[in-house]
Amino acid sequence: MSARIIMVTGGQRSGKSVFAENMALRLTEHPVYLATAQILDDEMRRRVEAHRERRRERWRNVESPLMIAGTQLADGEVVLIDCLTIWASNWFFKLGEDTDAALAEMKAQLDSLFGRPLTYIIVTNEIGLGGVSENAMR
């Protein structure tokens, strides 16, 4: 059996995470939530806390901004990855201008994950459907 992959995409703050969480809970009693965000400012802290509060005890929460393939998972589990866009950004920031190395690392991790018989619900951003930042990323 191969991996089942479900993509959930939409604009910034469009309800993607809630939609994906509800889908995961319909598929299994205790899904795995693989969070990729890093808390770098107060806004992100509030958003992460809201996500944690919403999930509570039914979820097994794993926070991994980079090494998602190292997560201990049992065959057949439902895994929500939130968010693929942030995860990719984390790799690009970590490796700087070495785009080829970042892409190779991401591909290796996804190949490792998707080689398992699990269901993945992957949240990603539809770039261009969200707001425009008032300041440059650093």
Question: What is each stretch, according to the model?
Answer:
Residues 14-21, 77-79, 111-120:
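Short, functional N-terminal and low-complexity linear motifs
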